[in-house]
């Protein structure tokens, strides 16, 4: 099987499994000009009729972080022109924004990029945003969460379909994307910061994953199977937690007696829903009130008090 057929086959398999496109007509591609987004664009143009898409357009966000940023922007404009595609370009000083808002460059860049994409989505009437996240991105994300401490959600990473975001390359490996691009003779730009191992994600990409692949050369495929198992188990837990939440929640209170009878995994999920927080320490602080009296201050005006068999927000919020 040639590289193009391999990638197309995996994209179609994902569509069969997840129905990532189900009625969407106008798709906006988050386009950096890198090999991933170039291949994604080529694939969606090829499958445009198959997915019944009316329009596929590009959106490029210039982070103004690198000297080559202007070069990348010009490449993206030329790429769109060659294919007679509409392109929207945004630009913002990410470094200045990060400093003003006490955010990392990565956090600030992501925030501004998605803000721009969603503004275009809404103002221009697109149905969804397609991003070029692939299987290796998923693996890196999962490993990053693992190093910081996480539960099922972190290990699962991102999903192929989340709100307005679509990730058609979810099943595709980075190596398969690169082989596709070379096979088709596609041009792209390189982001030199992808090789800076001072960045945690890059360190995982260039140092950790190669070592893991020495243990299991089919690491990505094995990981994807694990993610599918974890997603099914999370779905079951979420369904059970939702049932329990409806059973134990009365207004701004939880029924402690009923909640204490349930497994720890469900207790935590119900508490997370109730307080609107995923932070492990905060969830455990609240859970401690199931065993004793007292109160917990979660900040932002959220105070929880144990009142006999009830755990309630006080004052009510």
UniProtKB/Swiss-Prot annotation:
CDD domains xrefs: TilS_N
Residue ranges that the Swiss-Prot or TrEMBL entry lists as coiled coil: none
Gene3D superfamilies associated with the record: 1.20.59.20, HUPs
Record's catalysed reaction(s): cytidine(34) in tRNA(Ile2) + L-lysine + ATP = lysidine(34) in tRNA(Ile2) + AMP + diphosphate + H(+)
Role description: Ligates lysine onto the cytidine present at position 34 of the AUA codon-specific tRNA(Ile) that contains the anticodon CAU, in an ATP-dependent manner. Cytidine is converted to lysidine, thus changing the amino acid specificity of the tRNA from methionine to isoleucine.
NCBIfam families linked to this entry: lysidine_TilS_N
Name of the protein in its database record: tRNA(Ile)-lysidine synthase
Taxonomic path: Bacteria, Pseudomonadati, Aquificota, Aquificia, Aquificales
Encoding gene per record: tilS
């Amino acid at each position: 099987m040639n590289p193009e057929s391999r990638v197309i086959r995996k994209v179609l398999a994902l569509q069969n499994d997840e129905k990532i496109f189900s009625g969407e007509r106008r798709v906006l591609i988050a386009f950096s000009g890198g090999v991933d987004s170039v291949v994604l664009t080529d694939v969606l143009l090829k499958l445009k009729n198959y997915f019944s898409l009316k329009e596929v357009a590009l959106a490029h966000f210039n982070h103004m972080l690198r000297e080559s940023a202007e070069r990348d922007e010009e490449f993206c404009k030329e790429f769109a022109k060659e294919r007679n595609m509409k392109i929207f370009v945004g630009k913002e000083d990410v470094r200045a924004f990060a400093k003003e808002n006490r955010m990392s460059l990565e956090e600030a860049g992501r925030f501004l990029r998605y803000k721009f994409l969603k503004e275009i989505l809404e103002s221009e009437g697109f149905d969804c945003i397609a991003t070029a996240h692939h299987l290796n991105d998923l693996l890196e994300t999962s490993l990053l969460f693992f190093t910081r401490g996480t539960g099922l959600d972190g290990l699962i990473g991102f999903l192929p379909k989340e709100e307005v975001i679509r990730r058609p390359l979810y099943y595709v490996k980075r190596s398969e994307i690169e082989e596709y691009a070379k096979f088709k003779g596609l041009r792209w730009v390189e982001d030199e910061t992808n090789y800076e191992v001072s960045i945690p994600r890059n360190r995982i990409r260039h140092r950790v994953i190669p070592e893991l692949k020495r243990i299991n050369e089919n690491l990505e495929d094995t990981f994807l199977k694990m993610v599918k198992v974890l997603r099914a188990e999370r779905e079951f837990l979420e369904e059970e937690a939702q049932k329990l939440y409806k059973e134990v929640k009365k207004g701004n209170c939880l029924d402690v007696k009923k909640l204490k009878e349930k497994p720890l995994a469900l207790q935590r999920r119900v508490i997370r829903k109730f307080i609107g927080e995923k932070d492990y320490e905060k969830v455990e602080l609240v859970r401690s009130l199931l065993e004793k009296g007292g109160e917990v201050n979660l900040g932002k005006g959220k105070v929880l008090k144990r009142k006999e068999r009830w755990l309630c927000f006080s004052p009510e919020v």
